[in-house]
Amino acid sequence: MPFGHTFDRLGSVKYFTWDDAKNEKLKADRGIGFEEIVFLIGQGHVLDILEHPNQQRYGGQRIFVIQRDNYVYLVPFVEDDRLIALKTIIASRKATKQYLEREPDDHET
């Protein structure tokens, strides 16, 4: 079911969609749902967009890297001319370390 929208680089409207049953399961199991992901995207909390590393199995999928508070979530998605279909939400300790826990510079004390 589409919820919310965003604009691509050319100004075209894109609608978000997802599986409602999957969304309810994510909220129950992980404490976060697709509605919040769409809100965070709209608020500029996208740290990166990656190609899915397993294109053979998940061809065409990309991954939003989203910051929520002090943690990073990976959100696989597929996109066409008018829809962005969100697939799941994965809390990632590895991505949190990579994107949010920067190494201090040598000149910092």
Q: Each PLM stretch: what is its role?
A:
Residues 1-109:
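Ribonuclease/tRNase effector modules and their secretory precursors
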